[in-house]
Amino acid sequence: MNQQPLVSGDWDKVEKKKGFFRSFLRDYGKVFGGNAFLLVGNMLVFVIALCVVMLFVPMVFPVFLPDKLKEYILDTGLVEKSLVTDESVNNIYYLMCMIASFALCGLGLVTNGPFCSAISYYFKNVLIGENDFKPDIKKGLKDNWKRSIGASLISLVVTIVLIYNIGFYQSGAMWSGMAATAAKSFFFCLLSFWCCMQLFVYPLIACVELSFKDVYKNAALMAVQNFPIAILVFLIQLILFIALPFTLVFQFGSTGYALMVIFYLLFSFGFIAYISMYLTWKAIQKILNNSL
């Protein structure tokens, strides 16, 4: 692999942009291109994410089953019983599964690793002002595809295991009461922290010469050292990929659906990838400064 060496002088170029939002506004056109690239990449793993949603998410959220969803809609009393047909419920169910699948991709839990590391490499060069889209993407794919595929598989397996454990303890199959609640909360916290770690994994793969083990070790350390910001970004991810899409679709109908698609096409994935690279640079700069 031939990643560019990380030196403190590179960060000086980033700092001249005077903050994240000014940097993002200046680079939005490039972020838009990166968003399109990531959207294509995520389409390739969307089927995998959809399988995870259909097989494991109902263990945590039973409404992700058509019959349970129908019961929930009827219990709310907000819709006349005559309107709650199997066809309408199935349409809502598949829409929910679609949004949840994109959410797994947006949270970095089910990803196309080579595409994520390639766009991280490109965004790093965008931040230092030495970017060229096609060569950067090509180099990012060529240099890091093996480790990135490994990271994708690890993320998928860990995500499934954590979701399964949350659902298992929620069902009360082994424990009940406070013990089950504590176990479920523990695995939920692990899943949340795993999401925070994913913010740093692909930028580290793309930009630093580290062993596979050290990538995850440093991602965990960076998530801890930058915990308040990482949690803030995690909350932004939840808003962009869960709260906002569900609100738009179920409150504003076809107009909301169109707005959701626009967010996916123009903004959501690229914005999070850009934040991810920016956070990693700041974390690396802290390490460089402490080593001086």
What does each of the following model-derived ranges do?
Residues 163-201:
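Membrane-helix boundary elements
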